UniProtKB/Swiss-Prot annotation:
<dbReference type="GO" id="GO:0004386">
    <property type="term" value="F:helicase activity"/>
</dbReference>
<dbReference type="GO" id="GO:0005524">
    <property type="term" value="F:ATP binding"/>
</dbReference>
<keyword id="KW-0067">ATP-binding</keyword>
<feature type="binding site">
    <location>
        <begin position="37"/>
        <end position="44"/>
    </location>
    <ligand>
        <name>ATP</name>
    </ligand>
</feature>
<keyword id="KW-0378">Hydrolase</keyword>
<dbReference type="GO" id="GO:0016787">
    <property type="term" value="F:hydrolase activity"/>
</dbReference>
<dbReference type="InterPro" id="IPR027417">
    <property type="entry name" value="P-loop_NTPase"/>
</dbReference>
<keyword id="KW-0347">Helicase</keyword>
<protein>
    <recommendedName>
        <fullName>Probable ATP-dependent helicase 25</fullName>
        <ecNumber>3.6.4.-</ecNumber>
    </recommendedName>
</protein>
<keyword id="KW-0547">Nucleotide-binding</keyword>
Amino acid sequence: MDVEIKEYAGFVQNEWVRGVASLWMTHPGDGAIVLSGDAGCGKSHAVGQLIEAFSRMGFAECVNITATTHKAVGVLKQPSCTTYQSSLMASIDMCQANFEEFKCLFDARHRQAIEMWDRIVSNRTGLAAVKKGHSCVTLNMRCPVCVATIHESIRCTDKPYPYFIARTMFIIDEYGILSELSLKKILYALSKFKLPGQGYILVFTGSVSQLPSPEHPQIWQTPLLRDMIINTYSLFINFRVEDAAYAEAINLFQFNVITRPAVEMLNARVIGANAVDAEYCDSVTRIFNGNRERDAYNTRHTMVMEGRGAGRVDLTPVIEHVGGSASCRFGALIEYMCSTVPKIFNKATKGKRTVYEGGYVFVLPTQERYTFFGLDDVNTAVVGREDGRLYLERQITKYKGWTVSFFPIFPVAAINTYSAQGETLDRVIYAPPEKNYSMSSIRASAYVACTRVRTRTAIELSCNSFAKSVGRTNMFPEKLLNHKKSVEMGYVPRECPY
């Protein structure tokens, strides 16, 4: 990238940070800001700059940095970052509940904090005067001194309280995965901890150009989001483009456009049956649309590793029933583990995984890729890469009379496109469905898979079933594209005067 372009990109990010900070300080009520852009345009960097700016100005206690997935949390690399569910202290039951059930569960779980908040609201003038030399006449959630006073008061409750309280700069990365129900739950939680005339600024970063949430309506389908938005901005300079022609061709998939360069480049990368041959470039991660194809490849890869004499290690979780009045059945425990750690637990294997020394694994929660070296002892797994080794202890989960301990790693020979989201990989082999790709329920998978790499030479395909000819395609719904153009990119439709 040219130095001048890089400097301009930095200027654009700094201006966005300045604008967001100014809006937050001058707009005491609720609102939303959307920051979008293609992969590599610096959204995570801009968010990091925003957090640094708030820290320099003394507003660190006013910021709540979250993401929709554990993977996105890892990508942000911010020490205080959690999933938005963790910030709300939402249990698995609350995450799975409908809206009415969620309200009851939230109120019950945070009853003490809500009652304390009501007392804070009633005494907001007196609390503002607690700190000597403090000029606020009443508590102000845009003032760091007032926010610190609020947090000190909330800490007086016997139970833990949600982290987000009074942190009115509420950032949510990878917002495109949210559903209308998720947004309603977030807004309900915020509504319980407001001061009169004061609210929260939600900063949504990411894009709707990704695989959809299983919940409907999705975030782009609800007027609830549109009604909240105060400002949107789309970053447009890509920092990691090493193959500009490839990047431009694949980025047009977002707009359901297939160009001639896209067809020619992808056709040239087809390797046929080698894509699913576990002995062909076995160190390269395979990406499949479906779990069945992924699992079949992983089985073949297992056979290859055993044939080479690689050391086999069975990772079996330790499950103990400690009992108690609230104890649940074993089946209910497994259902809970499947919903909270789906990468490791499923009903068939119940958390048992087979990995091989010298093979590749993903480490939770960040899903970063490492080489598996073996077990140091019964409770310590050793993984590593070029920058050193990492010693992993078993992760412990307690649930209704049970204790489950397991290693937070899973094999990575092949993954599905949902797991691939957010990854940047050195090389990828993508095996899409050969027939009727346009009938798939996750047609955006091709865009996800092709954007995991920086250059055309870093991707190989079993077939090019998704970009066979120049013209229009249907990777994304038209209404989603309308949201992207108007909300994320700020396009204003106008009628042609001619």
